[in-house]
């Protein structure tokens, strides 16, 4: 049996997410946007709640097509509020639309969102050597800095805790614990 990080439950969905996605470096803007949306909706909730609704989010939000989301009408916003398959939080839905618009602005400024976000770690994942749950932080000075920059640009639901979870999800930091089979020093 494989040793996994402490937070992985018995849920096959969680196991697959941990084994195939979490901590794997993502440089593709479409996937970076998907995780931005999912992490912002996760604020205040458990990640398994988001994973359980991920396909519903994908369907409701046009496969996380940020160009489409950036142009959502009031009617589309209202239909999202009625969609029981997603988290129906008014502020989070509005922020998804606004964040899509701002995501495009960042792309225009930097050439891609990937160039922007990965510049914070010099395009290379930070590999941590955490042994126990207590060592893994909820925020860091770097997540504080990224959060502050995104907020200054107008992004919503991008507090430091959300941004650190985002950094973990997209592989900017490798926080697999040293006893996990996915841990790597590279």
Predicted segments, located by residue:
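HhH-family (HhH-GPD) DNA N-glycosylase catalytic core used in base-excision repair
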Residues: 1-186
């Amino acid at each position: 049996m494989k040793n996994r990080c402490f937070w992985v439950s018995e849920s096959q969905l969680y196991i697959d997410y941990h084994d195939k996605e979490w901590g794997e470096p993502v440089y593709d803007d479409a996937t970076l946007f998907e995780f931005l949306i999912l992490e912002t909706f996760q604020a205040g909730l458990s990640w398994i709640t988001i994973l359980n609704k991920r396909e519903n989010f994908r369907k409701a939000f046009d496969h996380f097509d940020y160009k489409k989301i950036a142009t959502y009408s009031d009617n589309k916003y209202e239909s999202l509020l009625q969609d029981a398959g997603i988290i129906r939080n008014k502020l989070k839905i509005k922020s998804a639309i606004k964040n899509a618009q701002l995501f495009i602005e960042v792309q225009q400024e930097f050439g891609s969102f990937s160039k922007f976000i990965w510049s914070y770690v010099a395009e290379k994942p930070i590999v941590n050597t955490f042994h126990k749950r207590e060592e893994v932080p909820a925020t860091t000075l770097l997540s504080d800095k990224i959060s502050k920059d995104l907020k200054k640009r107008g992004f919503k639901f991008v507090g430091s805790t959300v941004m650190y979870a985002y950094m973990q999800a997209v592989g900017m930091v490798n926080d697999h614990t040293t006893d996990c089979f996915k841990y790597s020093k590279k």
